[in-house]
Amino acid sequence: MYYLSDLSHYAFFTYISVRAGFAFFIALCLSLFLMPKFITWAKAKNASQPIYEYAPETHKTKCHTPTMGGLIFISSAVIASLFCIKFDNIFAISALLCLILFCLIGLIDDLGKVLKKDNHSGLSPRMKLLAQIIAGLICILPLYFSSELSTELFIPFYKHPLFDMEIFAIVFWILVLISSSNAVNLTDGLDGLATVPSIFSLSTLGIFLYLSGNLNYSEYLLLPKIQGLGEVVIICAALIGALMGFLWYNCYPAQVFMGDSGSLALGGFIGFLAIISKNEILLLLIGFVFVLETVSVILQVGSFKIFNKRVFKMAPIHHHFEKVGWVENKIIVRFWMIALLSNLLALASIKLR
């Protein structure tokens, strides 16, 4: 679409905002169109993920709900992005690679569980970790060696870099990618619970990317200046559109789950956006719901191993609230509210520095 701008009547395609808008609506329409067809096919093939044996009783009714919906909304976002981005932009190409590779890891994991009807038949934790490290390196190393990406570490509400991580930045970035990917995966346990916070996080990071990629805005707001980041905003918009199409079928009561093919890809992509926009630390606030879910699991496992006692009735923490009697819809909406507030606070850091 960008290359149509060479024609005199299509010069407006040079604008990132225009191409982002097109990408959003293309992905939204693709997702809305393809998802019901996928649901019908998945039901016919009995492509549903087994329910965890210790899950709350209310989850037993979800045993026939199709999974792997992430494959559809990620594909929709990628197709829409390919129509709208510039192909000579290393940030955009690396971002698409991140989406595709982490989606493939999740898809392999999903297929193992679906085909054998066993939650433990997907990728082993060790194999999944290794695959995530390799995928992360494929996405990050080209940026590192091209010198397009700063290795300086920035913290929220402070305009200067804290220090230069140099070669250790690679290790730190891989840690961010893997942590973010798995955090969203842990959150995806209730209908729409991971979807809406992901939309909020993508929107916030998209704003940071747009501002940092614009030399005038970045200079005025004292943000890191990184030329070329604006193209990734188009992919953000496409993924938000695809997620909104998915949410139409994923909201309570869900007709389809995203599966690991969706959650691992979303988390990995959100982590990647935080890295290239220099918001690795602020990601703790941008993805606060994901952090909350992850910390609850760490506390639960750590407490049980050390003290032989559980902190929560069940982890991740959304299951704890189910166990104490909260209805699923109430948990979902309250977590959405927390995600919205945390992202508004993160956006406040743009001016407060």
From Swiss-Prot:
Any single Gene Ontology cellular-component annotation: plasma membrane
GO terms classed as biological process: cell division; cell wall organization; peptidoglycan biosynthetic process; regulation of cell shape
Ranges that cross the membrane: 22-42, 65-85, 88-108, 129-149, 161-181, 192-212, 228-248, 256-276, 281-301, 330-350
GO molecular function: metal ion binding; phospho-N-acetylmuramoyl-pentapeptide-transferase activity; UDP-N-acetylmuramoyl-L-alanyl-D-glutamyl-meso-2,6-diaminopimelyl-D-alanyl-D-alanine:undecaprenyl-phosphate transferase activity
Source superkingdom: Bacteria
Pathway involvement of the protein, from the record: Cell wall biogenesis; peptidoglycan biosynthesis
Pfam families per the UniProt record, alphabetical: Glycos_transf_4
EC number: 2.7.8.13
UniProt keyword annotations, A-Z: Cell cycle, Cell division, Cell inner membrane, Cell membrane, Cell shape, Cell wall biogenesis/degradation, Magnesium, Membrane, Metal-binding, Peptidoglycan synthesis, Transferase, Transmembrane, Transmembrane helix
Enzymatic class: transferase
Subcellular compartments: Cell inner membrane
UniProt topology in membrane: Multi-pass membrane protein
Annotated catalysed reactions: UDP-N-acetyl-alpha-D-muramoyl-L-alanyl-gamma-D-glutamyl-meso-2,6-diaminopimeloyl-D-alanyl-D-alanine + di-trans,octa-cis-undecaprenyl phosphate = di-trans,octa-cis-undecaprenyl diphospho-N-acetyl-alpha-D-muramoyl-L-alanyl-D-glutamyl-meso-2,6-diaminopimeloyl-D-alanyl-D-alanine + UMP
Cofactor: Mg(2+)
Function (record text): Catalyzes the initial step of the lipid cycle reactions in the biosynthesis of the cell wall peptidoglycan: transfers peptidoglycan precursor phospho-MurNAc-pentapeptide from UDP-MurNAc-pentapeptide onto the lipid carrier undecaprenyl phosphate, yielding undecaprenyl-pyrophosphoryl-MurNAc-pentapeptide, known as lipid I.
Family the entry assigns: Belongs to the glycosyltransferase 4 family. MraY subfamily.
Name the record gives this protein: Phospho-N-acetylmuramoyl-pentapeptide-transferase
Naturally occurring in which organism (per UniProt): Campylobacter jejuni subsp. jejuni serotype O:6 (strain 81116 / NCTC 11828)
